[in-house]
C-alpha cells in the first residue's frame, strides 16, 4: 500500500522463490483498476485472470530464478504515467532488487476488429534484448492464437511497461490493442473470447518459463529486430491480406513503418 496526493492505493504482489536468490527475478504484471466505474472486462480483468492462472501453474515448478507476480493499482487516468501510477511506485520501491525481465499484459481478452486476424496477439518489446527475440522464435503460440512481434514505439507507452522501458529493464508487452469497447461501459464479460484468453495464458507460461532460463546479456535495445518482424509479417499477415484482395509487400524497416501505420488505422490508434 502507498499514499499519493492524499489518496490510498494498493499493489498486490506475490513471489514464487527460486533456488538461487542471487539471480534477478522475472516479473509478470498487469493493472487491476478500471477506467471510471466501467466493468473493465477486457481492461483489465482478462489480464488479471491470466496472471493468476500462470501464477498457479508456476508455483508448482522449481526453478533457479524467482518469479514475481504483480497486480498494479492506478494505471488508468488520471493516474496514468504519474507518480501515483502503481507500476511506477512498485518499480521505485523495488529498484534495488532489479529485474531480469518484465512481462506486462493489458487488453488481452478480445478479438481484433480485423477480419481474418481476430486471433492475433501483439508482442512488443523484443527489441530490448536479443535473447527475447530468440525466445519468441523458439516458443510457438499454438493453434488458437497467432503472434505478431513488433516494436513498442509503434504504440508508445500505453501501459505498465513504461517504467521498465525508461529504466532499461528488458520487457515484453502483450496486448490485442484497443477496440470499440475500450474505456466504455460496454466492456463487459460476454464480449470476451475465453478461448483466446486461455491460449494467451498458455503462451505466457511458455515464454515466461523460457525467459527465466534465458541469458539476457544486453545491451538494452542493442540489436535490430527487423528480420524477426519481417518473418512474422510474411507468415501471419501476407496470407490474410491476399485473401482480402489486398496483397502487400513488406521487405524492410520503411515498409514495416508503413504497415504499422496501416494496422493502427484499422485499430483506431
In which residue ranges do the predicted regions lie?
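Active-site-adjacent substrate-binding region
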Residues: 107-227
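Short, contiguous, pocket-lining structural segments
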Residues: 5, 20, 43-46, 50, ...
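Soluble metallo-hydrolase cores and metallopeptidase-like ectodomains found primarily
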Residues: 1-39
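Solvent-exposed, polar/charged alpha-helical surfaces in well-ordered, non-transmembrane soluble domains
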Residues: 49-52, 56, 88, 134, ...
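Acidic/histidine-rich catalytic neighborhood of metal-dependent amide-processing enzymes
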Residues: 6-8, 34-127, 161
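Structural recognition of the beta-strand scaffold that forms the well-ordered cores
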Residues: 13-15, 25-29, 68-71, 100-106, ...
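Short, electropositive alpha-helical surface patch
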Residues: 80-89, 159-169, 228-239
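Acidic, Ser/Thr-rich low-complexity intrinsically disordered segments
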Residues: 217-269
